[in-house]
Amino acid sequence: MIAAAERYLETRNGTIQYLDVGTGIPTLYFHGTGAGNDAALLLEQPLLKSNCRLIIPNRPGYYSTTLGRRGSANFCADLAAELLSHLMITRAVVIGTSGGGMPAACFAKCYPHLTASLVLQCAQSHRWDEGKWLPQGLGHALLLFRHRIFTFLLRWQNARHAKASQRQPITCLRHMSGRRFPEIYDDLNAAQQIAELANLTLICSAAPAGIQNDWAIMVGDNGVTQNSIRCPTLIIHDRADPLVPFLHAEWSQSCIIGSHLLGIHAGGHLIWFGKDFEFMNTERIAFIRKSFPA
């Protein structure tokens, strides 16, 4: 595994903790909910091996990155723009994964001159204004996410789940893969990476400012809106994703003119495993290279 040390940047908006690893196409990566940039580095080794330079800031509230304006995808995008300026990068491919989808889309909307292309993978894109946008089986809990008085309850449940997943990583694998679980439960690579992911998730659950900020974004941010993004866009989503319903991918495609939706059969929310992983990664790399020619 290609590893890297955390770096820190002090800006007018606060501290950014980030990873800058690899050489090649500059790729600004917005990690998912529940774990920080270390989880993205764990899962995205294929990008590093395909000549991508991964720049992965911890999003607001995760580890040492400043929380800033609660529930603001714009604040996250602004921090990322400051990071690119510091690194003297004038254009980058932007990737948003899972809960990082809304901040990535916000970056592409607010900083089109910095965005060569956008990849939304298993990504949240629509505000949680109806139960259908929430993870499978959680639609009835929308009220809890809308009112801060219930935050302690959500935080407790998240920590409880993280502890269970760390004790038995197979629980985490089942939760994230949904009905794809029978297809990947005996995948040794998946088992090893999910065990490590469960450890990272447990760490973040103990200091949940970033997770709580993500919940606020999901219920309060506009997400992807009609015709707000103009760059080449690839949307990658497993049709059986149990955590981010496929509706999010269809919504993104309907809003972003000329976008391409790659509906895959992978590992549910875990697009890095399963039947279509190699196909997905080949298509993803081809898209990135086309949008950022040498």
What are these regions (language model features)?
Residues 14-66:
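Conserved HGGG/HGGXW glycine-rich cap/lid loop of the alpha/beta-hydrolase fold
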Residues 75-93:
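Conserved acidic catalytic loop of the alpha/beta-hydrolase fold
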Residues 91-134:
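Conserved hydrolase catalytic core segment
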Residues 118-157:
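Flexible "cap/lid" loop of the alpha/beta hydrolase fold
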Residues 145, 149-224:
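Alpha/beta-hydrolase
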Residues 229, 235-237, 241:
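Short beta-strand/loop motif that positions the catalytic acidic residue
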Residues 242-248:
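Conserved alpha/beta-hydrolase "acid-adjacent" motif
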Residues 258-294:
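Catalytic active-site module of serine/aspartate enzymes centered on a nucleophile-bearing elbow/loop
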